[in-house]
């Protein structure tokens, strides 16, 4: 009579031995070699603990309408004109003070509630005998980040240009870029640099000196800089015409560096560990099957229906 395959169920083969046997010692050794070396490999390959991460964010930047201008005149080496929005600075300039006409506007081009660009124009009246050879200009901004930690600071854009021939206009078109010497925190409120770049209440001339202002600003770990201003110097000024500065300053999306939190570090380390562990699990599983099937270490093989081994452990 012909026979047909009617039913089947899997059988698991268990190997039994005493706790003090060579088989138990072998299993303990292979378990240690399975789980510990992947940890060492991941750690020694560098980058196991994520110490710095980054993300993109559009900063919330607003022009504070604070300006400090120094226009270098020629041909006399010490000739200059100066003006700022700080009354004390203006009083200190004496005969060098010259009040310009200033206009500015900011635009939110993509209507996301954050300004994207500043259009700044300054017209400095000049005498027919006065000729501008160089410009030093400071504009201050309020700079905020909110996606990870809340970071607030008052920053500046510093522009300095000088040329060999007198000019009539200066065109500047650049980006206000963030510069970090250290990463930000991943949470909390950071207002350590939310102080005025220029101490407008100080009665001392040193606090308005450009060298002092720039040096103090560069001591910060987080600053902004006017990147790629691409200055265009136009010559040929009419006798009664003012010297004009046109500036277009964009506020681009930034890549922010920050210190990751504990759970982000664990997640990053866990991914590296598991990816290496899977290889070790596969290799040592084959080694254990070979050793026990070929009785390299003495054990008692027992055929057990699938699931019975788990029931024994539970009982």
UniProtKB/Swiss-Prot annotation:
It holds the Pfam family TM231. The chain crosses the membrane at residues 23-43, 262-282. Disruption phenotype: Embryos die around 15.5 dpc with severe vascular defects. 10.5 dpc mutant embryos have defects in patterning of the ventral spinal cord that are characteristic of defects in Shh signaling. 14.5 dpc embryos exhibit microphthalmia and polydactyly, consistent with disruptions in Shh signaling. It is found in: Cell projection, Cilium membrane. It is a multi-pass membrane protein. GO terms for cellular component: ciliary membrane; ciliary transition zone; membrane; MKS complex. InterPro entries: TMEM231. Glycans are attached at residues 194, 199, 221. Keywords: Cell membrane, Cell projection, Cilium, Cilium biogenesis/degradation, Glycoprotein, Membrane, Transmembrane, Transmembrane helix. One of its GO terms (biological process) is cilium assembly. Belongs to the TMEM231 family. Part of the tectonic-like complex (also named B9 complex). Interacts with TMEM107. Transmembrane component of the tectonic-like complex, a complex localized at the transition zone of primary cilia and acting as a barrier that prevents diffusion of transmembrane proteins between the cilia and plasma membranes. Required for ciliogenesis and sonic hedgehog/SHH signaling. This is Transmembrane protein 231.
